[in-house]
Design a protein with these regions (language model features):
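Catalytic alpha/beta core of large soluble enzyme barrels
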Residues: 110, 374-376, 428-433, 503, ...
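Short cysteine-rich clusters marking metal-coordination/redox-active sites
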Residues: 690-693, 706-709
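Conserved, charged catalytic cores of large soluble enzymes
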Residues: 96-157, 225, 234-248, 258-358, ...
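Terminal amphipathic helices with adjacent charged low-complexity linkers/tails
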Residues: 82-96, 299, 356, 362-367, ...
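Core nucleic-acid recognition elements
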Residues: 9, 35-144, 148-161
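Function-dense linear segments that define catalytic or interfacial modules
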Residues: 141-149, 153, 161-186, 191-234, ...
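Internal maturation/activation junctions in enzymes
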Residues: 205, 320, 420-443, 447, ...
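Short Cys/His-rich micro-motifs in 6-15 aa windows
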Residues: 709-715
Length: 715
């Protein structure tokens, strides 16, 4: 028998789902007999067959009514009441969805639907959505498949659409928003040059502004800019230096409000050898304001050795190549650590490690990265990103039992994951082909290398489903195992695409040719990016981050609803007799973490951890485990407790260098407190609040993200 869902999707009638809904309601009132729930579900199925058997279809509302009737007739009054309340909550969510004016034919969460409407759905002249959620995915799939062979387009369109509707893979935000629209600029990130002359500076400013106009963050290196006070021969004056130039870049970014209500962002890096490096490190204390700039110091292996040896470090004028002064290497690193301890900036990129893995050294050097640091790029290069949702690649396995609170054992569905990766690689390669790049120089560079960045999200969700603690040795082992699998399949698929469609034009002389490949479609294949709003669309945790908190306040139609507790955690607690209660849910919502709640079994507390429950060293080791099997870089925040010291930050930096990371960003809890409002005895940090809904911002993957409304600086 077919079931017609509220979203108009059609599914087969499943007795297990009915039994689960009855048992969850029973658990709300202290019930523990899952066998009774299954027996009642069979009674419901029998009555449905009797009443709807001839028409062979039934709606979810009719199923719910039948469950209520059976529970009441069998005198399970408390369970019936809980079931009715649960149905009412679902009705409220459906009403809120309808009020958004968006047809949800896929079955997204309310929060995901809000994100889709605000950022990705095409709108009419009145600003209202003119496509359904499924229509959006169909639009994207059709546009990306348009570059496939005519006889294969329909096949790939259906595969692309299916994988997005099942929330197995999501392309980057610009691809979702712009595919098949008047603005076919689909790339999220670019890198532009910044030469050391006035004409070149303003040409780069103009070109980067054009990119931002069409949607996309831009990375720069200021390593070629002469230092402040250096001579300018044409005017006999003195140079302003890189820090002053940052203000120019920031102000230009203020002009463009990008598609999807995301203001343009920039990454600025400066080599550790630059004479203005100390001013750069302290630039947020210098009176300047850079809300649209992330900035990082480009660290070399030679500098790390100098720090270890506590030796002097030479600062070199990039214009003349001459040493201008010598400073303490350790003192310089401590200054960077002190500022990061104070407000989270600057980050570090390990430029030698980045260049070591440059796939096309014959084409040019990698000098900087994109907005959030996960994508090293050549000048005038862009990268198209997308992420596989790991949380939906877990399946039941009844061979053994791991934890008593689990619903049965689980394992990674590698067959499904392989299919998702292969389709995702092809989708991103098609993005390169169909994207309209605003600058010819960008189009030429991108088509020469055809770089893509397939990554992952939902890592914390996957670990929970596998009953593995994020901060355990097993999690680190799994991280390497999963990412190696994704990388190997991604490389294999790119090689197959190279044979089918041709290798990237700069293949000759590339690392891939030297490694024995005869064909390779993409100069890079894997990247772990900040998943920003696309993880909210997929209902997944961000990238490889742990859960920021186990409860969030969700926004509904401009107002805040009651806090929402992590659904996997609720299920786990309900499977332990006598633990679940509404009061416990309120306590979890208030604390955000369960580490200190003794009434929750220890095994559950070990598995459901948050970012602040995890040591900085474990964060770095997780970053390194994924970086080992990632072509490009990995974006991840290293969270430190409020009581952490500058020396703790130093240790994190040195550990990241030792473990061959390509970049690192730290955030010490409660460190961003430049703007403080005193309201009675309560202090609130403005910088930590979402600019759209005033909810608390999470710092994840080096990027600010709001779990309440979906706001994100990084798509």
């Amino acid at each position: 028998m077919k079931v017609i869902k509220r979203s108009d999707k059609v599914q087969e009638l499943d007795v297990a789902k009915i039994a689960d809904s009855i048992f969850l309601a029973a658990q709300d009132v202290g019930g523990t007999d899952d066998k009774l729930a299954k027996k009642l579900a069979k009674e419901v199925i029998a009555r449905i067959d009797k009443h709807y058997g001839r028409i062979k279809k039934v709606t979810t509302a009719e199923i719910g009514d039948m469950v209520e009737r059976v529970l009441l007739e069998k005198t399970h009054y408390k369970t019936a009441k809980a079931y009715i309340l649960n149905r009412e909550k679902k009705r409220q969510v459906e009403a809120a969805k309808r009020a958004l004016g968006v047809h949800d034919d896929v079955g997204l969460s309310l929060n995901a639907l809000l994100v889709a409407k605000e950022k990705y759905l095409l709108r009419d002249t009145d600003g209202e959505a003119r496509e359904s959620v499924g229509g959006m995915f169909d639009r994207v799939a059709k546009f990306l498949a348009s570059c496939e062979k005519p006889k294969d387009r329909k096949i790939w369109q259906e595969k692309f659409s299916k994988i997005m509707k099942e929330q197995r893979f999501m392309p980057g935000g610009r691809t979702l928003a712009n595919s098949g629209s008047a603005n076919n600029q689909l790339a999220n990130c670019f890198v532009m040059p910044m030469p050391d002359d006035i004409e070149g500076i303003f040409e780069s400013l103009k070109e980067s502004s054009i990119l931002k106009k069409y949607g996309g963050g831009v990375g720069f290196t200021f390593g070629h800019i002469r230092p402040k006070g250096d001579s300018v021969s044409t005017t006999s004056g003195a140079a302003a230096g890189p820090v002053a130039l940052m203000q120019l870049i920031n102000d230009a970014s203020d002009i463009y409000l990008q598609a999807g209500k995301r203001r343009s962002g920039n990454m600025v890096t400066l080599p550790i050898t630059h004479p203005d490096i100390i001013d750069f490190i302290h630039c947020k204390e210098s009176g300047y304001n850079y809300p649209h700039i992330n900035f990082s110091v480009a660290i070399t292996n030679k500098f790390i050795e100098a720090v270890k040896n506590n030796s002097e470090w030479e600062l070199i004028n990039p214009r003349t190549g001459l040493v201008t002064s010598k400073v303490s290497a350790r003192g310089l690193m401590e200054e960077a650590a002190r500022m990061a301890w104070k407000n989270g900036d600057p980050g570090l990129i390990f430029i030698d490690e980045i260049e070591k893995h440059n796939p096309t050294p014959n084409v040019g050097r990698l000098e900087t990265v994109n907005l959030c640091g996960e994508q090293p790029l050549l000048s005038y290069e862009a990268c198209n990103l997308g992420s596989v949702n790991l949380s939906v690649h877990v399946q039941e396995n009844h061979k053994s039992q791991i934890l008593k609170f689990s619903n049965g054992d689980t394992e990674i569905d590698y067959k499904k994951l392989e299919e998702s990766v292969r389709i995702g690689v092809r989708m991103l390669d098609d993005v390169v082909s169909v994207c309209t790049y605003p600058l010819k120089k960008v189009a030429d560079t991108v088509h020469g290398n055809r770089k893509i960045g397939l990554g992952i999200m939902g890592w914390a969700d996957m670990l929970v489903k596998l009953h593995v603690a994020y901060d355990s040795p097993k999690a680190l082992e799994l991280a390497s195992e999963v990412m190696k699998f994704v990388q190997d399949i991604g490389h294999d698929e790119s090689a197959k695409l190279g044979k089918e469609k041709g290798s990237f034009p700069n293949f000759k002389g590339s690392r891939w040719q030297k490694n024995g490949y005869k064909y390779f479609r993409n100069a890079t294949v894997t990247t772990i990016a900040p998943t920003g709003t696309i993880s909210m669309m997929a209902g997944a945790s961000s990238g490889i981050e742990p859960h920021f908190a186990l409860a969030y306040t969700r926004r509904s139609m401009g107002e805040f609803t009651l806090p929402e507790v992590n659904s996997d955690l609720v299920k786990a607690i309900k499977h332990v007799n006598g633990v679940y209660s509404a009061e416990l849910m309120d306590e979890i919502a208030r604390l955000g973490s369960i580490r200190g709640i003794a009434t929750i079994p220890e095994k559950i507390r070990e598995i459901f951890v948050t970012a602040m429950d995890i040591t900085p060293e474990t964060h770095v080791r997780m970053l390194s485990a994924f970086q080992k099997y990632t072509d490009n870089a990995v974006s991840k925040t290293i969270n430190l407790p409020a009581e952490a010291t500058v020396e703790d930050v130093m240790n994190v930096y040195m550990m990241a260098a030792e473990l061959k990371c390509k970049g690192i960003t730290v955030y010490r809890d409660k460190s961003r407190g430049e703007q403080v409002l005193n309201v009675g005895k309560v202090e609130k940090k403005i910088e930590d609040l979402c600019p759209e809904c005033k909810g608390k911002l999470a710092i994840e993957e080096g990027c600010k993200k709001c779990h309440s409304c979906g706001y994100s600086v990084c798509g």
